[in-house]
Amino acid sequence: MAGASIEATLELWASSLRNVKARLRPLFRQERVAASAWKFLDGLLGNEPRKTGWMRAEAAGDPGPWRQQAILGRGWWDAEALRDIVGDYALETLADEEAVLVIDETGFLKQGKASCGVARQYTGSAGKITNCQIGVFASYVSRHGHAFIDRALYLPQAWTDDPERMTAAHVPDDVSFATKPQIARRMIARTIAAKVPFSFVAADSVYGTGELETALRKAGKGYVLGVAANHVFHSWGKKQMVRGSAATIARNIPKSAWRRLSAGDGTKGARLHDWAYLELADLDAGEYNSTLTGKWTRGLLIRRNIADGDLAFFSTWCPQNTPMKKLVSVEGHRWAIEDSFETAKNELGLDHNETRSWHGWHRHVSLVMLAFAMMAVIRHRANITSSPKKTTLRLRITHRS
């Protein structure tokens, strides 16, 4: 087929929606509750700009928002099971051995103090300290597309140290304080335990060093992890000895060592920066896991903004002789999760959750993840049938199940 026709695209949408609704059904004991969940999903995928309970209810033909609200609050179903359904569904289409698992967070701006996990804290979504919730996410990024496969609500210690507040927000008894890097390690461990294929992890400096690095080395996974300018690196077993903070090392890099490379294509074309890469040590993989063999290289990757010279630093771990261009590409995969947050908020109502409970947050976010995964699957399947001359399909279709 030279290109996906409108009719074929509409049928792909309809069949995909039937597929994901069928996967949802086992989560619910009663058909009527499942039907409400299906309508909730319809509302997320619809054209209404605000995905509030009233808006979703109006689109579903319900007399009021209580059925939509019950799905997130009063109903009995397992959001963790839905998370696993989302991952399985997305990976059926997106799985690739060279995929990158990207860890990042996003903020959910809030008013008041009752919403689970809300606090005055920094969020890049607002670019400042403000009243918000923070969600940590794992996105699976491959040549076939990208989708969220895990999520968790971050609870500040002011919350976990307040039993009454935790009870009021219906936080499970076994949930205790965890740093964002600890949340990330749990997500990565779940992904590895599920035998999800991927070769690298990418994350910013919130998650970048210490126990996460060790865990990934033991798992035989490469990484490109952001670090602060004052993070100390040193080399051993190399001809060129290096020791000092990342910023100090960068000042001593000769001009000839910098290369202008693209970290991938963005909305305005190639995302070009200047890059430098220092190999610091070659180590036996067996030092971390007796079942692994071969040499792996620990390194420092530096990115320099072409316009203003601003520097960013990354700790790297990769098979020996991995080219710098590969590490730059891995770091560039982080753009996909930023794009995912924007799309999920603007089109699917990721940040339109009106509930205040722990379960409500995870249920709402998991349903949005399912909607996003469905769009990723449709986009991939539609575009592989499209002519190279055609514009990449952007799916926002009024649907009927």
Please annotate each region the language model reported.
Residues M1-R32, L44, L155, H170-S176, ...:
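A short, flexible helix-boundary coil/loop motif
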Residues A2-A202, V206-L225, A229-V232, K239, ...:
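Conserved, well-structured functional cores that handle cations and Mg-NTP chemistry
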Residues A35-W38, W54, C132, A312, ...:
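Non-catalytic, well-ordered alpha-helical scaffold segments
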Residues F40, D308-W335:
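Extended, non-catalytic structural segments that build the interaction scaffolds
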Residues G64, I306-L311, C318-P323, A344-N353:
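Short acidic (Asp/Glu) and glycine-rich catalytic loops that position anionic groups and cofactors
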Residues R217-K218, E331-G332, S387:
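Short, solvent-exposed amphipathic alpha-helical segments in soluble enzyme
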Residues K326, I337-T343, H380-A382:
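Extended hydrophobic-aromatic, low-complexity segments
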Residues W335-E342, V368, F372:
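Feature representing long, continuous alpha-helical segments
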